[in-house]
A protein has these predicted regions:
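Small/polar loops that bind or transfer phosphate-bearing groups
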Residues: 10, 71, 223, 277-278, ...
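Short acidic, Gly/Ser-rich segments with clustered Asp/Glu that frequently serve as metal-coordination loops
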Residues: 12-18
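Short loop or secondary-structure boundary microenvironments that flank
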Residues: 12, 72, 253-256, 279-280, ...
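Thiamine diphosphate
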Residues: 1-6, 19-139, 146, 150-362, 367, ...
């Protein structure tokens, strides 16, 4: 991979916190193929940027380890010269293009009124006159069109050359990129049954990743300074370092938002399935990029551990309450909360094959006893919800649970049976997938009893649609 990545950014973009996170990381890694074209016009929606910003951009960017080039953004020769210079750069580069917003507009040039509002028909006439532009709307002058076609032909030649190289190396490249997931998951399921151990689902995830990273070249892992807690780094990983990109694991530092944005970029590039870890409570720092993963239909996997009040000693600031409900409300996002090692394996399996849907794996810190002890070729977690226990053929109530609370639901079901109150327990690792099932299957799961109960160590909001108005929801609707 030797191509450049060009970023177009404005004044407002560089006020955002993610710009500091991402540029700091890029500078640290010396990403020489990264070039940012900064439209430096000193105007934002409210007015001049001086209302809110007095940064020394040159010092700021250079302190991150970036090269800085200042040019007149309206001078094509300066633009060309700067772009030529960055081709041999050893660092990421900012080309600060000093421009005037609304250029050519007699009444709105250099003003915030031209930022997000139409110029208006009368002002457009004045702009045409100012720029000596006599062509009809949407008419491309012949000279410009001719030059554009030349660029297209140049690109076509490069593409043809690349296709020829790919054709000659197709078998080798396809072998590198081929995912051998099916065999791995089949084996891991059998290992889980044979070992029959209690373990945290974050540990189950690590064991699954260990098997996947041993034989796979498409997974790019990482963590926001929590690798040892998220269990995202395996013994097979090689760390990506400055000037050494022949690796598959990124130490993102405490940069959750940038990590999520980088993973989106890796997925959009193609041939990679990125995953990154942090605590579930910090999913709020990742939220804008998680939403974009879903909106852009990218296969990005977020490993979110310490997923309930069972996380340990950190207290209410680190105990997720509303996070699961919020994440489950995002369209085209699969939020998985596995109950044991077998479910964790199946959740990973579904996440990796979801080419147009990102996934969140909500995992525990505390140990979970194995629940499913028989091998099944069927991925039950792909159904979103399934019956995991029934105390009698004819039952009185249905108990829904996810993750660490499934074992609690099973224990409660057995105790109720002693009092001749019979029930079935539904493990619901992914509400999003269950909602996509056929009506007949949903009726089978939901429609058997009038009395329904849900148990989850988090906000109860997202369970009410399953248990109904007469149901009971056991959860936590206050801070921990």
């Amino acid at each position: 991979i030797n191509h450049k990545t060009y970023v177009l950014a404005g004044d407002g973009c560089l006020m955002e916190g993610i710009s500091h996170e991402a540029m700091s990381l890029a500078g640290h890694l010396k990403l020489k193929n990264l070039v940012m074209l900064f439209d430096n016009n000193s105007i934002s929606i409210d007015g001049p940027t001086s209302l809110a910003v007095s940064d020394n951009f040159k010092k700021r960017f250079e302190s991150y380890g970036w090269d800085y080039i200042l040019i007149n953004g309206h001078d094509e020769k300066e633009i060309f010269k700067a772009l030529k210079k960055v081709q041999n750069s050893k660092k990421p580069t900012v080309i600060s293009c000093k421009t005037k917003i609304g250029y050519g507009s007699p009444n709105k040039s250099g003003k915030s009124s031209s930022h997000g509002s139409p110029l208006g028909l009368e002002e457009i006439k004045l702009v045409r006159k100012s720029l000596n532009w006599n062509h009809k709307p949407f008419q491309i002058p012949k000279k410009i069109l001719s030059e554009w076609k030349k660029i297209g032909k140049k690109g076509e030649k490069i593409q043809t050359k690349w296709d020829k190289v790919y054709k000659n190396r197709k078998k080798k490249i396809d072998k590198i990129l081929k995912n051998n997931f099916t065999k791995i998951f089949k084996k891991e399921k059998q290992v889980a049954i044979n070992e029959n151990k209690s373990m945290a689902s974050r540990k189950s995830s690590e064991l699954t990743l260990n098997a996947l990273t041993k034989e796979n070249n498409t997974l790019i892992g990482g963590s926001a300074d929590l690798a040892g807690s998220n269990n995202t780094k395996t013994k097979h990983h090689k760390i990506i370092k400055p000037n050494d990109f022949n690796g598959d694991y990124i130490h993102y530092g405490v940069r959750e938002h940038a990590m999520s944005g980088v993973m989106n970029g890796l997925a959009l590039h193609g041939n990679f399935i990125p995953y990154g870890g942090t605590f579930l409570i910090f999913s709020d720092y990742c939220k804008p990029s998680i939403r974009l993963s879903a909106l852009m239909e990218q296969n990005v996997i977020y490993v979110m551990t310490h997923d309930s009040i069972g996380l340990g000693e950190d207290g209410p600031t680190h105990q997720p309450i509303e996070q699961l409900s919020g994440l489950r409300s995002i369209p085209n996002l699969n939020v998985f909360r596995p109950a044991d090692r077998m479910e964790t394996i199946e959740c990973w399996q579904h996440a990796l094959k979801s080419s147009k849907t990102p996934s969140i794996l909500s995992l525990t810190r505390q140990n979970l006893d194995p629940i499913r002890k028989k091998y099944s070729i069927i991925n039950k977690c792909s159904l979103g919800a399934y019956e995991i226990l029934r105390t009698r053929k004819k039952i009185n109530l249905t108990i829904f649970a996810s993750g660490s609370e499934v074992s609690l639901a099973i224990e409660a079901s057995h105790k109720l049976a002693k009092d001749q109150i019979y029930s079935k327990v539904i493990s619901m690792p992914c509400q999003d997938l269950f909602d996509q099932q056929a009506v007949s299957y949903k009726k089978k799961i939901l429609g058997e009893t009038n009395i329904k109960i849900s148990i989850e160590a988090a906000s109860t909001d997202c369970w009410k649609k399953y248990v109904g108005n007469n149901g009971l929801t056991f959860g936590i609707d206050t801070f921990g």
